């Protein structure tokens, strides 16, 4: 009320038959207090008047007193009277609580008890009260529970607050407001459990304003009302509601949260505020600085209480509660009330009245939200998301939830160009988060991609669609996510992408769907019937990418190439083809240890740290038409040089091959070359037929013996001093048909009639070209060969 404005006139309260005539109930137009007026004597008072003694019913007759005789009877009567004044015996828990806190009747309330409006007092036992509770699924557990307030006018709120309520467009209280308001006005502890978007914020703010008006504390001595919230977004949202509905009543408020400078927050505290909305972490920091006093707090609210306790704020909350006097009123407003949290909450509340909207023990989703659960693979998520976004009306607000901050940023960048999206998560600074939320509220950025940091308590109007791109890590978070739409009586739509890795939540998700009368997909029911296992039968011998391993799942989660498919990329491609890698000739090439050891020089250049070699390799790949042939020829020449360097190793390999008759491991594909018949007359070291590679002693099939002295052709090879720098690393197509062993024999027995290209044609030389200038990078093994003279 501004200065110079006449105070509002009082108004009559609803008729109360229990009032003696001619008393009438009045409501103060300025403060909203209920008081009583006698029009005959013009006397007003806050205490409810009692009827005259002549109108009181006669008391019941007392039983005749027992006969008394002697001193012992008088002592016995004295003990009986003292016992009758002693309160009933209670358990140790009640005694411990009363030692720290006084009873509800002796809390920090004003000297005159503020009664409920007469309409609520007389309707507590009215049949319409039970009908109202049954219609709105209200369950109340506690003592002396008043009837719900069905209209704002009967709540006893001052005209300033009523004007703000009417300006906000509220026609009647929500069920949680209607039942929790009269309980809170009686200075009782409250546990209010209701679905998201049910108006819990005003459920504790308006009684808190009435509490402030009754006490008339000095704001400079500290706040009177303290509200704790788990996240910065929820805290700022509560502050906005407190400022909007408390401005006309001259109620000052401030918000304390991390991620913002402390200077402005400390200045607000120094000026004095009535209401403090804070996160536990920042409030503890300011308490350690001794810049705030909570000795005057008598109205404590824990919004999203289960969330704060689940997030690990229990030590901070207990530390804050120790700074608050025990004579206080505590209220917990939340959407869920798990059994694990009830034990902790018993230490913070005294004889609370529990008000539940809907089911008591199970999670309940808003029935006004249409839930669509789609079983989908990770690689199909982005394409389906784009289809949903294109089907929405232009300018519709869509909220998308992801589980990781990295995915949140990447998905926002992908959608920004087409739809205009922004991201919000815990790594964003407070200014960035406020800017993103401002753009989302105004419609400048109609799509918001968020993590669970924005899932609890975020109240943004006109959110049409909520999309769970990644299923949350708990079914409680799912209820809070979809609760961002369908608020304040509106309807909404929720889409949920459900993958095989989320199968452990299938049974709980079905309960949520059935509780809200939503359709349950058949695939989801089948998954739940299998005990939460995946929906597809997995092949034991499938590759990792086929089984949906970690790499393929990660790549598909981030959209794959171009953000559309879940291609696993180069790493997964090599893994998936490791066991089944087929060449052009149809034979299987095992990419095991042997292949990695015999990688050609071009492959080694590929992993070279030198940018120059990498560029050369990229140019050679564009000019080479037969990379596999170049690799085969280079592999065999390298094997022959490694055998020829060590005479001891050569003799050792010869003895091993002669004694055992077993084939040496091929440096190439590791396969044995078998011939249809064996001829022991052939000499192993001097082959006349290059197609025969049998062992001379036992006639068993063996490998080509590469342990020999270098030939003149080898001495003039690429590592010899006479090398002219122009050579190739591939063999002719005709020699390649018989495999790598034949290529080795061609290099061992060259054709005299062939041109001096070391057994290769010009076509082969062009195909195996490595560099534009024909140079080959130095190799330490080549230098060792040159120093040894090229032969042993």
UniProtKB/Swiss-Prot annotation:
Q: Name one GO cellular component term.
A: nucleus
The UniProt regions of compositional bias labelled Pro residues, in chain numbering, are 52-68
Q: Which domain of life is it from?
A: Eukaryota
WW domain residues: 17-51
Subcellular location(s) of the protein: Nucleus
Q: Where is the motif (Q motif)? A: 150-178
Query: Where on this chain does ATP bind?
Result: 194-201
MF term (GO), any: mRNA binding
Which stretch carries the motif DEAD box?
303-306
Where the record annotates domain Helicase ATP-binding, the positions are: 181-355
Task: Spell out the Acidic residues composition-biased ranges.
Answer: 764-777
Predominant subcellular localization, coarse grouping = nucleus
Q: Could you tell me the Gene Ontology terms of the biological process aspect for this record?
A: nuclear-transcribed mRNA catabolic process, nonsense-mediated decay; rRNA processing
| Catalytic activity field | ATP + H2O = ADP + phosphate + H(+)
Q: Where is the composition biased (Low complexity)?
A: 1-16
| EC numbers on record | 3.6.4.13
Q: Which residues form the Helicase C-terminal domain?
A: 384-528
Q: Which family does it belong to?
A: Belongs to the DEAD box helicase family. DDX5/DBP2 subfamily.
> What does the record's free text say on domains?
The Q motif is unique to and characteristic of the DEAD box family of RNA helicases and controls ATP binding and hydrolysis.
This one is known as DEAD-box ATP-dependent RNA helicase 40
- Give the source species: Oryza sativa subsp. japonica (Rice)
Q: Kindly list the organism's lineage.
A: Eukaryota, Viridiplantae, Streptophyta, Embryophyta, Tracheophyta
């Amino acid at each position: 009320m501004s200065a110079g404005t006449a105070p509002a006139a009082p108004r009559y309260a609803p008729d109360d038959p229990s009032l003696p005539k001619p008393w009438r109930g009045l409501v103060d137009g300025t403060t909203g207090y209920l008081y009583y007026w006698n029009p005959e004597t013009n006397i007003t008072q806050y205490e409810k008047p009692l009827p005259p003694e002549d109108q009181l019913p006669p008391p019941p007759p007392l039983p005749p007193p027992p006969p008394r005789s002697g001193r012992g009877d008088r002592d016995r009567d004295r003990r009986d009277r003292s016992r009758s004044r002693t309160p009933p015996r209670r358990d140790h828990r009640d005694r411990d609580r009363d030692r720290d806190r006084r009873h509800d009747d002796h809390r920090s309330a004003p000297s005159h008890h503020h009664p409920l409006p007469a309409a609520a007092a007389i309707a507590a036992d009215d049949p319409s009260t039970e009908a109202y509770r049954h219609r709105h699924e209200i369950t109340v557990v506690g003592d002396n529970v008043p009837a719900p307030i069905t209209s704002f006018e009967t709540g006893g709120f001052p005209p300033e607050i009523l004007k703000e309520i009417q300006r906000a467009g509220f026609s009647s209280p929500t069920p949680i407001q209607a039942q929790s308001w009269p309980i809170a006005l009686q200075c009782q502890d409250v546990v209010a459990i209701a679905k998201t978007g049910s108006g819990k914020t005003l459920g504790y703010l308006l009684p808190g304003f009435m509490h402030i008006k009754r006490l008339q504390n000095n704001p400079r001595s500290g706040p009177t009302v303290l509200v704790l919230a788990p996240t910065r977004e929820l805290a700022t949202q509560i502050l906005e509601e407190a400022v909007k509905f408390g401005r006309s009543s001259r109620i000052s408020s401030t918000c304390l949260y991390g991620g913002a400078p402390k200077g402005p927050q400390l200045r607000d505290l120094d000026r004095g505020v009535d209401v403090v909305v804070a996160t536990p972490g920042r409030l503890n920091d300011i308490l350690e600085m001794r810049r705030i006093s909570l000795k005057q707090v008598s109205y404590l609210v824990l919004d999203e209480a289960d969330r704060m306790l689940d997030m690990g704020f229990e030590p901070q909350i207990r530390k804050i509660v120790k700074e608050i006097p025990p004579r206080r009123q505590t209220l917990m407003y939340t959407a869920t009330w798990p059994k694990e949290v009830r034990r902790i909450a018993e230490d913070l509340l005294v004889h609370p009245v529990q008000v539940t909207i809907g089911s008591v023990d199970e999670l309940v989703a808003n029935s006004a939200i249409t839930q669509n659960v789609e079983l989908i693979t990770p690689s199909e998520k982005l394409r389906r998301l784009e289809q949903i976004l294109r089907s929405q009306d232009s300018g519709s607000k869509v909220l998308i939830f992801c589980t990781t901050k990295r995915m949140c940023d990447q998905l926002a960048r992908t959608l920004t160009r087409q739809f205009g999206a922004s991201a919000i998560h815990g790594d964003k600074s407070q200014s960035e988060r406020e800017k993103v939320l401002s753009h989302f509220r105004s419609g400048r950025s109609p799509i918001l991609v968020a993590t669970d940091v924005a899932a609890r308590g975020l109240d943004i109007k006109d959110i049409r669609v909520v999309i769970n791109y990644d299923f949350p890590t708990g079914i409680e978070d799912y209820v809070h996510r979809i609760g961002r739409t369908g608020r304040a009586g509106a309807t909404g739509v929720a889409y949920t992408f459900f993958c095989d890795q989320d199968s452990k939540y299938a049974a709980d998700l079905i309960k949520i769907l059935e509780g809200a009368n939503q359709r349950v997909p058949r695939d989801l029911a089948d998954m739940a019937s299998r005990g939460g296992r995946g929906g597809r039968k997995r092949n034991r011998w499938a590759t990792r990418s086929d089984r949906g391993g970690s790499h393929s799942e990660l790549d598909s989660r981030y959209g794959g190439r171009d953000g559309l498919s879940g291609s696993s990329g180069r790493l997964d491609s090599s893994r998936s083809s490791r066991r089944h890698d087929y060449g052009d000739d149809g034979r299987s090439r095992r990419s095991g240890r042997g292949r990695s050891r015999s990688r050609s020089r071009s492959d080694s250049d590929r992993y070279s740290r030198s940018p120059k070699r990498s560029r050369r390799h990229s140019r050679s790949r564009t000019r080479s038409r037969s990379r596999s042939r170049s690799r085969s020829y280079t592999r065999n020449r390298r094997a022959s040089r490694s055998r020829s360097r060590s005479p001891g190793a050569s003799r050792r390999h010869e003895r091993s091959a002669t004694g055992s008759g077993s084939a040496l491991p091929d440096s190439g594909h590791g396969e044995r070359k078998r011939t249809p018949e064996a001829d022991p007359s052939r000499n192993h070291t001097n082959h006349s037929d290059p197609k025969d590679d049998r062992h001379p002693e036992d006639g068993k099939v063996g490998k080509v013996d590469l342990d020999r002295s270098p030939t003149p052709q080898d001495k003039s090879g690429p590592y010899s001093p006479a090398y002219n720098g122009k050579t190739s690393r591939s063999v002719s197509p005709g020699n390649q048909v018989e495999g790598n062993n034949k290529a080795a024999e061609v290099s061992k027995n060259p054709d005299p009639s062939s041109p001096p290209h070391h057994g290769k044609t010009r076509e082969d030389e062009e195909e195996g070209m490595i560099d534009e200038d024909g140079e080959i990078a130095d190799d330490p093994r080549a230098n060792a060969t040159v120093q040894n003279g090229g032969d042993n």
